[in-house]
From Swiss-Prot:
First-listed, main subcellular location of the protein, grouped into a coarse class: cytoplasm
Quaternary context: Forms a cylinder of 14 subunits composed of two heptameric rings stacked back-to-back. Interacts with the co-chaperonin GroES.
Matches recorded under PROSITE patterns: CHAPERONINS_CPN60
Residue sites binding ATP per the record: 29-32, 86-90, 413, 480-482, 496
UniProt cross-references to Pfam families, sorted A to Z: Cpn60_TCP1
Name listed for the protein in its UniProt record: Chaperonin GroEL
MF (Gene Ontology): ATP binding; ATP-dependent protein folding chaperone; isomerase activity; unfolded protein binding
Location(s) in or outside the cell: Cytoplasm
Organism: Gardnerella vaginalis
Length: 541
C-alpha cells in the first residue's frame, strides 16, 4: 500500500486534530453531571454510555493523520482501563491538555526532548505525592461510596460493597442480564466450573436433578478413563473408607462409564464422573488449581502415574461437592492454606505479566475460584439499551472499587491532582529544575487543572472560578459537582481510587511525551473509491 508522509508542524497538527476530535467527544462524560454518548452499531440497538474507553474504541476517523492522533489517545484510555478499570476519561482529558500545553512551547522553539524529561519528572513527583496522601479503605461504606460515584447510582454502590465484602478483593464480581426489572445479587460458594455429570444416572437428588457428595474423595486425572481395570482398582481403594468419589477427567467412556453407573445403581459405592473444564494447557492449569485446593495429586502420564497402580494418597478431599447437569461446585477443599496462597501469588504474577485481555480474564477467574469466590450482579431494565448502559456502569464501578481497596482513596473531583501538584511545585527537586525541563514541569502543573475545570464545566459552572476557589481551600476540601458545594470531599464520600488517578496521569504523560517528540508521520494513503459501473455496461447492446 502506498504511503503519505508529513513532517514537523504539519505532522503534529494533523495528529492534534484527531486527538481533539476524540477527546472532545469523550470529555463531555466527565463528572457526576457528565452527559452520555450514543454509539451507533452496524447491527442491533445503539449503545448509550459514559465510559471513556468504550467511546474511544468506536471512533475511527477518515483522515489518516487524524486517525493516528486518535489512536494515540485510545492507547491512553485502554492502558488506564487495563491497569485501573476506570479513569479513562480523566486520562484522555489530561493527555489533551498536556499535548496542547506542550505544543505551544514546541512551536515557540523549545526542545521537545527536554520538555519530555520535565514532564516525566513532574508526573513522577505528583504520583509519589498521591500515593503518600492516600487514605486506606477500611469500611464497607467507603467501598459503597466509591462505587456509587463511579456508577452514579447508590443502589449499585451498596450491591458492589456487599459483593466485595463477601468474595474479597481477589473474588470475581460479574454482571449479567436479569429477566426481571432491578438488581439482584447472587453468590457462589467454593470453586465452581462449567461442567456437569457425564451421566444422569449419577443424580442423588431427583427433585433438583443434582448429585450431592458429602465428604468425598476427589480423583483428578489429565487423561481419559476408559478401562474397567482402572475403575476396579480405584473402587477398591474408595470402598474401604465408605466415602463417595468424585472423578474429574478429560472424559469417562468405554467400559469405565457403565461400570461406574452400575456400581452407583446397585449402591456398591456412590460416585460421580465429570469432564475437566477447559482445553490444553488451560485444562492442565485448572486441574492443578483443583489439586492444590483439595489436597489431591493429578494422575498424569507426565508424572509417571497410572490409575491401575495409584494409592489413596493421590485423592483430594472436600466438605461437599454439588454436581448439576451443567456445573460442578467444590465446597471447602482440604488443601493446605500455604499451598493455596502460593498458587494465588503465582496466578497474580501471571496476571501482571500477560498482555492478552483474554488470558487476563481467564487468570482472574482462576484466581477468584481459588482465593475468594464469585458474586453475580444481575441487571434488569425497561429496555435493552438501558440495560446495556447500566451494565457498563456497574462493570466500571466494580473495578473502581477494587482499585480503591488495593491502593487507597483520594479526594475526588480532580481535587487530588491540583492539591498534589501545588505541593510538588514547591519541592526541592522541582525547584532545582532549570531551562526547558522546568518548562516541561510547568506544563504538567497547568495540565492537571484540566479535569477539575472540565467537571465544573459539565456541571454548568465556570471551571476557572471553581479552580481558584479550590486553591484557597484546606487540603482534602474541594468542589462537589453533584451538589455544587465546597466541602470535605472524603467526608462527603466524593473520592477517587489512587490507582485510577495515578494511572491516568502516568499514561497521559507517556503519550504526551511521544506526541511532542514526533517529527514525521508515515500514514497509509487513502484509497480512492472504485468508479461505479456505467448504466447499461456489459449488457450486449
Amino acid at each position: 500500500m502506498a504511503k503519505i508522509i508529513a513532517y514537523e508542524e504539519d505532522a503534529r497538527q494533523g495528529m492534534l486534530a484527531g486527538l481533539d476530535r476524540l477527546a472532545n467527544t469523550v470529555k463531555v462524560t466527565l463528572g457526576p453531571k457528565g452527559r452520555n454518548v450514543v454509539l451507533d452499531k452496524s447491527y442491533g440497538a445503539p449503545t448509550i454510555t459514559n465510559d471513556g474507553v468504550s467511546i474511544a474504541k468506536e471512533i475511527d476517523l477518515e483522515d489518516p493523520y487524524e486517525r493516528i492522533g486518535a489512536e494515540l489517545v485510545k492507547e491512553v484510555a485502554k492502558k488506564t482501563d487495563d491497569v485501573a478499570g476506570d479513569g479513562t476519561t480523566t486520562a484522555t482529558v489530561l493527555a489533551q491538555s498536556l499535548v496542547h500545553e506542550g505544543l505551544k512551547n514546541v512551536v515557540a522553539g523549545s526542545n521537545p526532548i527536554a520538555l519530555r524529561r520535565g514532564i516525566e519528572k513532574a508526573s513522577e513527583a505528583i504520583v509519589k505525592e498521591l500515593l503518600a496522601s492516600a487514605k486506606d479503605v477500611e469500611t464497607k461504606d467507603q467501598i459503597a461510596a466509591t462505587a456509587t460515584i463511579s456508577a452514579a447510582d447508590p443502589e449499585v454502590g451498596e450491591k458492589i460493597a456487599e459483593a466485595l465484602d463477601k468474595v474479597g478483593q481477589d473474588g470475581v464480581v460479574t454482571v449479567e442480564d436479569n429477566n426481571k426489572f432491578g438488581l439482584d445479587l447472587d453468590f457462589t460458594e467454593g470453586m465452581r466450573f462449567d461442567k456437569g455429570y457425564i451421566s444422569p444416572y449419577f443424580v442423588t437428588n431427583a427433585e433438583d436433578q443434582t448429585a450431592v457428595l458429602e465428604d468425598p474423595y476427589i480423583l483428578l486425572t489429565s487423561g481419559k478413563v476408559s478401562s474397567q481395570q482402572d475403575i476396579v482398582h480405584v473402587a477398591e481403594l474408595v470402598m474401604k473408607s465408605g466415602k463417595p468419589l468424585l472423578i474429574i477427567a478429560e472424559d469417562v467412556d468405554g467400559e469405565a462409564l457403565p461400570t461406574l453407573v452400575l456400581n452407583k445403581i446397585r449402591g456398591t459405592f456412590n460416585t460421580v464422573a465429570v469432564k475437566a473444564p477447559g482445553f490444553g494447557d488451560r485444562r492442565k492449569a485448572m486441574l492443578q488449581d483443583m489439586a492444590i485446593l483439595t489436597g489431591a495429586q493429578v494422575v498424569s502420564d507426565d508424572l509417571g502415574l497410572k490409575l491401575d497402580s495409584i494409592d489413596a494418597s493421590v485423592f483430594g478431599h472436600a466438605a461437599k461437592v454439588i454436581v448439576s447437569k451443567d456445573e460442578t461446585t467444590i465446597v471447602s477443599g482440604a488443601g493446605s492454606k500455604e499451598d493455596v496462597e502460593a498458587r494465588v501469588a503465582q496466578i497474580r504474577a501471571e496476571i501482571e505479566n500477560t498482555d492478552s485481555d483474554y488470558d487476563r480474564e481467564k487468570l482472574q477467574e482462576r484466581l477468584a475460584k481459588l482465593a475468594g469466590g464469585v458474586a453475580v450482579i444481575k441487571v434488569g431494565a425497561a429496555t435493552e439499551v438501558e440495560a446495556k448502559e447500566r451494565k457498563h456502569r456497574i462493570e466500571d464501578a466494580v473495578r473502581n472499587a477494587k482499585a480503591a481497596i488495593e491502593e487507597g482513596l483520594l479526594p475526588g473531583g480532580g481535587v487530588a491532582l491540583v492539591q498534589a501538584a501545588a505541593k510538588v511545585e514547591k519541592s526541592a527537586d522541582i525547584v532545582a529544575l532549570s531551562g526547558e525541563e522546568a518548562t516541561g514541569a510547568a506544563i504538567v502543573f497547568r495540565a492537571v487543572e484540566a479535569p477539575i475545570k472540565q467537571i465544573a464545566q459539565n456541571s454548568g459552572v465556570s471551571g476557572d472560578v471553581v479552580l481558584n476557589k479550590v486553591r484557597e481551600l484546606p487540603e482534602g476540601e474541594g468542589f462537589n459537582a453533584a451538589t455544587n458545594t465546597y466541602e470535605d470531599l472524603l467526608a462527603a464520600g466524593v473520592t477517587d481510587p489512587v490507582k485510577v488517578t495515578r494511572s491516568a496521569l502516568q499514561n497521559a504523560a507517556s503519550i504526551a511525551g511521544l506526541f511532542l517528540t514526533t517529527e514525521a508521520v508515515v500514514a497509509n494513503k487513502p484509497e480512492k473509491p472504485a468508479a461505479a459501473p456505467q448504466a447499461g455496461a456489459e449488457m450486449g447492446y
